[in-house]
Amino acid sequence: MNALQKFHHFFNCCIGAWHTERTYHYLDRGEVERSRTDFTIRTLTPELKEKVLADNNYPNHGVDGFLGFHLAFETVSEKGEEAGQELNMLFVPRREGPRGLEGDYLRDRAYEEDRPIVASFRFDPGSLQLVMTTTYTRVVAVDTITLLNPRLRLRQILTYQRPPHGQPLEELLLVGFGVEQKLT
């Protein structure tokens, strides 16, 4: 399988219902929080793919080859706090290089800010690892999903203070880890 075929395989494995247990380390305030999340992933229709492109003012190149998904999740923290969200996302491969497949990751709603957003992704076909990097107004989120097998994923979330333009990511605010198990 080439990189694009492995990318499709990765997401075919991700479609369905999942349960995750996560631990978040808030380094800026010295707190640790545990939570559990149930989420579902399903494919997007061509019409919804086009809407995600339009919401982000992204050039429409035809959506047939783009992988698009609807994500819905409900999270409960160990303190009993509940949060949920639904969003549509689209992955637009731009190039294949020595580090794998790279491209744009579009959402109709961002996690940190309630607006459409274009981020970047990199997919390593050897390790079946997807890294998504989103630059928000105040922070930069680096979210990594590693598919260990079709029913088990590892998740890592790193959130940095957004540095001045052109400067490296240095000030880490949050580190999160999760084990995600497929239910259906």
UniProtKB/Swiss-Prot annotation:
Family matches, as InterPro entries: Calycin, CpcS/CpeS
Class of the enzyme per the UniProt entry, highest EC level: lyase
UniProt-recorded Gene Ontology molecular function terms: lyase activity
UniProt cross-references to Pfam families, sorted A to Z: CpeS
Keywords: Lyase
The enzyme's E.C. designation: 4.-.-.-
Keyword RNA-binding attached: no
Membership in a protein family: Belongs to the CpcS/CpeS biliprotein lyase family.
UniProt function note: Covalently attaches a chromophore to Cys residue(s) of phycobiliproteins.
Official protein name in the record: Chromophore lyase CpcS/CpeS 1
UniProt source species: Synechococcus sp. (strain JA-3-3Ab) (Cyanobacteria bacterium Yellowstone A-Prime)
Gene name as annotated: cpcS1
